[in-house]
């Protein structure tokens, strides 16, 4: 069962190991169990390839905590995410359970332009995929080719902007393996509004008491986040999604 306090303890321990190798300004925690790192300026210092540096940190985490890891290496943040989410999941783990996958713009196009479903890709939800499929666009390769269509053709970038507005720009970039956002930009971002959130996916139905415990632990963690960010609030929103089949048990 989810144990938020234990997850946080291990997340903190693992993050402290990363800090032995990488400065905090070059690390962006994406979730409790996932981070982005910009290691560009560290490769020469350590005289390592990106894969060697990733493996060194993963082995340190494994030795210290007993937890193995999967890593995605890319020439930008998007390709790192895709390398981990899609490519690494389809390669054989080593004896320690470690999977490391690498992508650059060209290998992304070779390996993943025909990959389906589109919802496997970062930031492509079911709504996006459905709209694209209605126009016969089923892959990232289809989207990329559509983006360079001529003005008098049905398939061109105007179609994508018609479907998604300004969001089409990022979709087109991702179709080609580009990502305009850098680590520096992410770290410098200041939201107009402040909020914190937390989520858990339960792998089996929970009774009331177990579910209440999970919600309490998540709330406690968000309170700590608020304190850390020097924020106060008078509102909390709880959203519960469920598989309707579980109601039949």
Residue ranges and their predicted role:
Residues 1-179, 183:
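Gly/Gly-Pro- and Ser/Thr-rich, intrinsically disordered tail segments characteristic of DNA damage-repair
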Residues 120, 128-249:
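DNA-contacting surface of Y-family translesion DNA polymerases
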């Amino acid at each position: 069962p989810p144990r938020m306090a234990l997850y946080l303890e291990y997340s903190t321990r693992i993050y402290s190991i990363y800090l032995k190798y990488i400065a905090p300004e070059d690390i962006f925690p994406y979730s409790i169990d996932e981070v982005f790192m910009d290691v560009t300026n560290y490769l020469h210092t350590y005289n390592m390839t990106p894969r060697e540096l990733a493996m060194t940190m993963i082995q340190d985490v494994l030795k210290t905590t007993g937890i193995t890891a999967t890593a995605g290496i890319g020439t930008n943040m998007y390709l790192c995410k895709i390398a981990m989410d899609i490519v690494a999941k389809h390669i054989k783990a080593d004896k320690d359970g470690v999977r490391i996958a690498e992508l650059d713009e060209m290998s992304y196009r070779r390996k993943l332009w025909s990959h389906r479903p589109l919802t496997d890709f970062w930031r492509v939800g079911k709504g996006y995929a459905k709209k694209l499929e209605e126009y016969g666009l089923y892959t990232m390769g289809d989207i990329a080719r559509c983006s360079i269509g001529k003005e008098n053709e049905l398939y061109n970038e105007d179609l994508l902007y018609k479907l998604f507005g300004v969001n089409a720009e990022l979709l087109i970039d991702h179709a080609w393996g580009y990502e305009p956002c850098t680590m520096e930009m992410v770290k410098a971002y200041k939201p107009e509004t402040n909020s914190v959130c937390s989520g858990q996916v339960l792998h089996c139905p929970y009774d009331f008491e177990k579910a209440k415990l999970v919600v309490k632990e998540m709330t406690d963690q968000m309170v700590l986040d608020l304190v850390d960010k020097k924020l106060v609030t008078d509102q909390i929103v709880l959203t519960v999604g469920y598989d309707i089949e579980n109601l039949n048990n």
